[in-house]
Amino acid sequence: MKKILFVASESVPFIKTDGLADVVGSLPKYINKNNFDIRVILPNYMSIPRQWKEKMLYRTHFYMNLNWRTQYVGVLEYQYEGIWYYFIDNEFYFAGNKPYGNIYEDIEKFAFLSKAVLTCLPVLDFRPDIIHCHDWQTGLVPVFLHDSFQKNEFYHGIKTIMTIHNLKFQGVWDKKTVQDITALSEYYFSPDKLETYGDANYLKGGIVFSDYITTVSDTYAHDITMPFYGEGLDGLMRARSDCLCGIVNGIDYEEYNPEFDPFINKPYNAKNFRKEKIKNKRALQQELGLAKDDKAFMIGIVSRLIDQNGLDLIDCVMEDICAEDTQLIILGTGKDRYENLFRHYARKYSSRVSANIFYSNEQSHKIYAACDAFLMPSLFEPCGLSQLMSLRYGTVPIVRETGGLVDTVEPYNQHESTGTGFTFKNYNAHEMLYTIRFAKEIYQDKKREWNKIIDRGMAKDFSWKTSARKYEELYESL
């Protein structure tokens, strides 16, 4: 039986800021327990809700050197849904009301986490065959493993996998500070290792020293070898392309199930959605103060309101989107520019636009269930989970052809009656607007055809089962 250790900065249900937490919290449940002993290690943030902290049990503690610093390392544990979770405790690094702070704080925080993870393994009497690292916050794990820990026989032969959820975020800070924090020698700060334009890059270190690299979709794995999407690391990704693959994320089909969803007004399934789904639309219209109109084309957006997600395209044609027979519901927070944009239009067209400038898991479920279409015009999208959730709920995605959206949404072809959503290729506001109008035309004038699109989308399997089998094959190969 192979032993696998997930190392990450967040995981549902304990702490979440984005889709990384969904992946780390869901994937281990679907790995075959007969062949793999899989465990997860996370920071014990002060911001983790009390309901979870009360269930954690003290396991051990020790003191660890981080260069000239001597730091306390506590380890707590909790078994959730059959998976053992370990929590690295240190009030200096993990205090505060949110998991991430300024980059200069996080650089030291996650260097501490990476070294503490490796240091605690003999104390826990758990020697993983593979350490599976997620994003830049864990990028130093393979680096430390290659450096000082190789002097200890316990660590010999441990393999590492680096999963890139978003190459844009790399954990870059000045070399001198990182050297002071990590005590890594000058050997590690060359252009073929951690150094990037004179600074130190945590994610680059993880990519260089990992045994294998994965991204969260096939298309994104190809995209990041190109300059436009490579975020300055495209050369490195090409150099390591023989150890790089894309595995599409899944979603938790137990949580995202319209037939048994406790958050939605009227449960439904692939057989009865034609009659029952509309009841969720009516309920959400009433809840949000929108016009009660069954024929209105209701579009949902659940997103961080940032440039990466294509909000500038929506800004360009917002007036056109807010047509008489269209309703738009937004859920999320982000840049002031976009928050204020949606607030403005919600005031201007109060019966057609609802701006919910916050995040609520319950509200997101209601939007997936109630809306007719779901808009994701991303500039780039490593994988994307929202389109998978919308397909699961029979809400037709309208997406730009990039990254994981290419791999998961099949473009509608009216001549062949195929496809699960509507797509557009170029990052262009009017091309997006044309696609929205085309989707609305099918919805309003060809309802039988629209329902067939929903049928095909709801029949797709984007659960973690398929993705988990691919990860199992990768684990076995290392």
UniProtKB/Swiss-Prot annotation:
Keyword Cell cycle: no
GO terms (BP aspect): glycogen biosynthetic process
Keywords recorded for this protein, A-Z: Glycogen biosynthesis, Glycosyltransferase, Transferase
Gene3D superfamilies reported in the protein's UniProt record: Glycogen Phosphorylase B
Pathway as given in its UniProt record: Glycan biosynthesis; glycogen biosynthesis
Chemical reaction(s) catalysed: [(1->4)-alpha-D-glucosyl](n) + ADP-alpha-D-glucose = [(1->4)-alpha-D-glucosyl](n+1) + ADP + H(+)
Primary role: Synthesizes alpha-1,4-glucan chains using ADP-glucose.
The protein's name: Glycogen synthase
Organism: Lachnoclostridium phytofermentans (strain ATCC 700394 / DSM 18823 / ISDg)
